[in-house]
Design a protein with these regions (language model features):
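Nucleic acid-processing catalytic cores of prokaryotic defense/repair systems
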Residues: 1-141, 152, 156, 168, ...
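Preference for the N-terminal adenyl/adenosyl cofactor-binding alpha/beta module
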Residues: 2-16, 130-371, 403, 407-416, ...
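Short amphipathic alpha-helical segments
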Residues: 6, 26-34, 186, 291, ...
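Short, solvent-exposed positions on alpha-helices
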Residues: 23, 27, 179-183, 526
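SAM-dependent methyltransferase catalytic region
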Residues: 45-57, 305-559
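Short, polar/flexible loop-turn hinges at active-site or ligand-entry regions and domain interfaces
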Residues: 78-82, 97-103, 122-127, 146-154, ...
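Soluble or luminal CAZymes and related metallo-dependent hydrolases
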Residues: 85, 159, 508
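Conserved beta-strand -> loop -> alpha-helix junction used to position metal-binding or nucleic-acid-contacting
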Residues: 104-116, 127-139, 399, 443-451, ...
Length: 561
C-alpha cells in the first residue's frame, strides 16, 4: 500500500538532511539510491538492480548504476559532475536493453541535484537536493500514485491490440477457442492493466511469468491457472503452503476469475508474446477503449482500425453533457461554497442511476461513470477546502459502479462492459488517492454493474431496474435501415411496434425509442438520449414514428447534427 504524500514529504526532508554533505559516487551511491527508494516506501531490492551489465553498440560492456526494468534508469555521479554527460551515458545503454525492459524515465544525479527525464512525454525536471520534498510528486510512478492522461489515437492502443491479437491467434491455432478463449483473454487483459495501475504491484504479473515459467512455455499455462485461482480466493481461504510469489497477489473477487476453464497450452513463442504484452504501459490505455481493444483482439481485420469501430469520447460527451452532466456541473458551481447543500448534492450524485439498453462493451457507461466520479472529486475538494492533508477515509466516497445498468445481446461484450467499469472505478480511486495523499482502493471487489446478456427488444427493462429507481437512459443502439435488417431484427421490430401502421419503413434504432418511451411512462422524470440516424427526423419516417412517441408523452429536449 502506498505511503501518504505527507509521509513521503517527511521522508524526503530527512533524506535531504542526511545526504546534504555526500559527494562520492564510488563510496555511497548504492546507499544513497537505497535511501532514495525508501522515501517512497519501496524496497529498492524488490524492484531494481545495481550494476546491470549491458553490451553497448561498440561491443564493450557497460554497467548501469540502477535499472528498474521498463520503468527507470538511474545514472549517479559524484558532486559537481556534468549531468548532460550523465544523461548521454544513460542513453548509450539503451541499444543493449531488451525492448520490453526499456525504461520510460531516466534520473541523473550528482547528490546535490536531480534531473528527471520522462522519455514518453518529452519532459524534464531539475531540482536541488534541498528541494526534493517539493518535487516528490514527480515520482508518483515509484510511490504508486501515477495518474495518466489518455489520447484516443495513442499508438499504444494499436500496439496493444496487435500484441494481444497475436497471442489470441496462437491460442486459437492450437484449438483453444470460443467461450474459453474469450474469458482467458479478458483475464489476461485485466492482469496487464492491474500491474500498471496499482491493483497489483508494479511488474508483479510480468515477474511471475518471467521468473517462474520456463523459456519453452511448457509450464506457463499451469502457472496462469494457479494465478487465476489465487485471484478468486480470499486470503484466509488460501493454502497455507501456497507459493510465496502467488500468495502476494491480492484477492480480486468480482466473478471474473470464478469460472473453471479448460487447460490452455503455451510454447516458446506464445510465452514471449505474453511478455511482449507485459512490456507495454497499460496504464495509458483508458478503460473507455478497453471494450474496443478487446473486440479488435478477437478480429484481426479490426486491429489496424482501432478507433473506427467505437463511438469516440468526444461524441459520447456530446450526448451525456446535455443529458445530465451540464446540469449537474451548473448546480455544483451554484452551491460549492455552501457546505450543507454540497453534502446533499453529494448524496444526490450517489443516487443517480444509468441504463444503456444496447451497451456493447460499455463505452457510454464507462465515460458516464468517469464524469460522475470527476464531479464527485470536485465535491470532495470543495468540502475539504483545498487541503490535501486529511485522511481520505473520512471522505465518504459514495459513487460506485452499481449505479450502472446495461443490456447487451452478445455475451462477451457484456462481460467486458462490467470489467471496464471496474477498471475505471479503480483508476478514479487512484485519482482520489493522488488528490488527498492517501491510498484508496476497493479490493476485493464488492459491487458491480448490472449487465444483462440478452435481447433488449425482447426484455422487460423493468426486470433490470425499476423505472422509479432510474435517472437516465443512454446509448448507441444499432441503426439498420429497412434494407439491412436481419430476420430476427425484423421480428423484433414487428413485436415492438405491434399495431403501428407503416412501422416497417422505420430504421432499426427507433425500436429503442419506442421501448424507452414505454418504460419512461412509469416515471416521467427519466431522461433519455440515443445516438441515432438523422433519417428518423426527416422524410417518411417522421409521420410514422413521432405521432406514436408524442402521444406517449415524449418531448425533444436536445439534439445534435
Amino acid at each position: 500500500m502506498p505511503l501518504s504524500w505527507n509521509e513521503i514529504k517527511d521522508r524526503a526532508l530527512r533524506f535531504s538532511r542526511d545526504w546534504a554533505d555526500e559527494s562520492s559516487e564510488d563510496a555511497e551511491a548504492k546507499s544513497f539510491l537505497d535511501a532514495f527508494f525508501n522515501v517512497f516506501g519501496v524496497p529498492r531490492k524488490r524492484v531494481a538492480t545495481f550494476e546491470q551489465r549491458i553490451k553497448k553498440l561498440d561491443g564493450r560492456s557497460g554497467y548501469i548504476d540502477l535499472l528498474w526494468k521498463g520503468i527507470l534508469l538511474i545514472e549517479q555521479k559524484s558532486r559537481g559532475k556534468d549531468l548532460d554527460r550523465a544523461y548521454q551515458q544513460a542513453k548509450d545503454y539503451f541499444p543493449g536493453i531488451k525492448d520490453r525492459d526499456t525504461p520510460r524515465y531516466i534520473l541523473v544525479s550528482d547528490f546535490a541535484r536531480f534531473r528527471l527525464y520522462d522519455l514518453e512525454e518529452g519532459k524534464q525536471h531539475e531540482f536541488a537536493l534541498a528541494e526534493f520534498y517539493k518535487n516528490v510528486r514527480l515520482f508518483g510512478f515509484i510511490a504508486g500514485y501515477q495518474t495518466t492522461s489518455y489520447k484516443e489515437q495513442d499508438p499504444v492502443n494499436i500496439e496493444a491490440a496487435e500484441r494481444m491479437g497475436r497471442l489470441h491467434d496462437k491460442l486459437k491455432d492450437i484449438g483453444y477457442q470460443g467461450h474459453r478463449l474469450e474469458i482467458y483473454l479478458v483475464r489476461l487483459l485485466f492482469c496487464l492493466f492491474a500491474e500498471d495501475t496499482s491493483i497489483f504491484e508494479r511488474r508483479q504479473f510480468q515477474d511471475l511469468i518471467e521468473q517462474r515459467t520456463s523459456e519453452d512455455g511448457a509450464d506457463s499455462a499451469p502457472w496462469l491457472e494457479s494465478l487465476f485461482e489465487v485471484l478468486n480466493t480470499p486470503q484466509d481461504k488460501r493454502l497455507k503452503k501456497l507459493d510465496e510469489q502467488l500468495g502476494a497477489f491480492p484477492y480480486v473477487n468480482g466473478t471474473l476469475f470464478a469460472e473453471q476453464l479448460p487447460h490452455a497450452a503455451f510454447d516458446t513463442c506464445m510465452r514471449q508474446l505474453l511478455l511482449d504484452c507485459c512490456a507495454l504501459d497499460w496504464s495509458r490505455i483508458s478503460p473507455a477503449i478497453f471494450g474496443s481493444l478487446f473486440q479488435s483482439v478477437m478480429d484481426a481485420t479490426l486491429r489496424r482500425n482501432l478507433g473506427a469501430h467505437y463511438t469516440t469520447e468526444k461524441n459520447i460527451l456530446k450526448l451525456i453533457k446535455p443529458l445530465f452532466l451540464d446540469e449537474l456541473r451548473a448546480e455544483f458551481e451554484r452551491i460549492k461554497t455552501h457546505r450543507k447543500r454540497l453534502e446533499e448534492f453529494h448524496q444526490h450524485l450517489a443516487r443517480l442511476t444509468f441504463l444503456d439498453p444496447a451497451c456493447g462493451c460499455g463505452n457510454f457507461l464507462v465515460i458516464a461513470y468517469r464524469e460522475l466520479r470527476l464531479l464527485e472529486l470536485d465535491v470532495l475538494r470543495a468540502l475539504d477546502k483545498g487541503e490535501a492533508s486529511l485522511d481520505v477515509a473520512q471522505f465518504n466516497i459514495l459513487c460506485d459502479v452499481d449505479q450502472f445498468y446495461g443490456i447487451e445481446i452478445e455475451e462477451f461484450p457484456a462481460q467486458i462492459a462490467q470489467t471496464a467499469l471496474w477498471l475505471m472505478d479503480h483508476q478514479m480511486n487512484m485519482r482520489v488517492s493522488e488528490e488527498f495523499g492517501k491510498y484508496f482502493v476497493r479490493l476485493p471487489l464488492r459491487k458491480s454493474a448490472t449487465i444483462l446478456h440478452g435481447n433488449a427488444l425482447r426484455t422487460d427493462w423493468r426486470g433490470i431496474v425499476k423505472p422509479e429507481a432510474l435517472s437516465y437512459i443512454l446509448g448507441n443502439p444499432p441503426f439498420g435501415g429497412k434494407q439491412y435488417r436481419s430476420i430476427v431484427q425484423k421480428a423484433d421490430m414487428a413485436a415492438t411496434f405491434a399495431g403501428v401502421s407503416g412501422a416497417g419503413v422505420l430504421d432499426f434504432v427507433t425500436t429503442w425509442y419506442r421501448k424507452a418511451a414505454d418504460y419512461m411512462a412509469d416515471n416521467p422524470t427519466i431522461k433519455a438520449a440515443f445516438v441515432s440516424t438523422n433519417s428518423i427526423t426527416q422524410g417518411e419516417q417522421v409521420g410514422i414514428l413521432w405521432p406514436d412517441l408524442l402521444k406517449r408523452g415524449v418531448k425533444i429536449h436536445f439534439a445534435h447534427r
